[in-house]
Amino acid sequence: MESRSILETIQMVAEENLDIRTITMGISLFDCVDSDGERARQKIYDKITTSAKDLVKVAAQIQEEYGIPIINKRIAVTPIALIAAASQDQDYVAYAVTMERAAQALGVDLIGGFSALVQKGYQSGDRKLIASIPAALAATSRVCSSVNVGSTRAGINLDAVGEMGRIIKQIAADDPVNCMSLVVFANAVDDNPFMAGAFHGVGEADRVINVGISGPGVVKRALEEVRGQSIDIVSEQIKKTAFKVTRMGQFVGSIASERLHVPFGIVDLSLAPTPNEGDSVAEILEEIGLESVGAPGTTAALALLNDAVKKGGVMACEHVGGLSGAFIPVSEDAEMIRAVSAGRLNIEKLEAMTAVCSVGLDMIAVPGDTSAATISGMIADEAAIGMINNKTTAVRVIPATGKGVGDAVEFGGLFGQAPVMPVNTNQPTTFIKRGGHIPAPIHSFKN
């Protein structure tokens, strides 16, 4: 490696907030299926704790040896609705508690996979799992849950969309902060290393290592060098920077895979912000030329950023996967927090932005009196964007119980704080109550 490249990487880590956001081990639980729920849960605990026993230790070794910060160590498992369905259990909270115990024993930050895939309808375990989500999140602190309600090939399960609005309200009634551990997806991916939406897909290997990178600060600093130049140069600069950032993810993932004796899966190319100053996706958009994120042109600037990150990153690693784009979680981005608080960025503009970037309406706080139907409508809109555009979209929304516009919900750490945003108060109740299934779009028929 050239000396200049080494020095560049050191500078990125020391001054520009470059890090590996997560090393996530995916673990299949299909060999844990049992008609006896208690036996199944013991198998799950044993499989997770055996498979990932060295994950935290190896991550610490890599960080120490190479000076590359590795922020999170995480686990994703097969959707529990598929595993628990064979048992006679009527309530799946105990499975979440088992996941929590395993995560605590290993010292990992989060564990995902308390999930159900209902894009085309419910199977026997799906309804039980969804009904268990509020109690499961209340009983745990490291467990993450997700439900996939639509896809380009299957359409949108409007019954599930309606149910998830009610579930989110139920969670918020107990503790709004628990809502940050639940994501409602369309076109969920099997190899996502990021939480709260990670689960281990049914077509994945028995165990796999996936890596998520982070580097908004690096991209912003690089763009400062091309101020006043054409947008072509901006795109090229982002591509070059994304290559360097992703190369580090490939390097760390390869070493972790080798030391853990687990196959290396993918690098997720997503730019993931944090509440730290200088680590913001919104600031990149402003560096491209917007007076503020939320201004006309925001969606175009984000589309440019997202595409350039993919083009640069895809050359730097063996396999790209996950969500791979730019995240726009309001509470986790310092400049977005300021823009929302000042009224420069609203939910409608964020929804437009989700058509061209990773995921969707993420870490958004809404007034506590927002109806379940309104939340379901937000989910339906995002699922429609994902379904029609053949991309992953999602909603992670926090109804701030007892709070209104102008207040804030404090999460702490990497999750930051979310200003409560105004929501259109016209109700979609009759639409959501219709239920049924929104058919897949005509362009989904590829065969």
Curated annotation (Swiss-Prot):
Family from the record: Belongs to the UPF0210 family.
User: How the protein assembles, per its UniProt entry?
Assistant: Homodimer.
Q: What name has this protein been given in UniProt?
A: UPF0210 protein lp_2507
Organism this protein belongs to: Lactiplantibacillus plantarum (strain ATCC BAA-793 / NCIMB 8826 / WCFS1) (Lactobacillus plantarum)
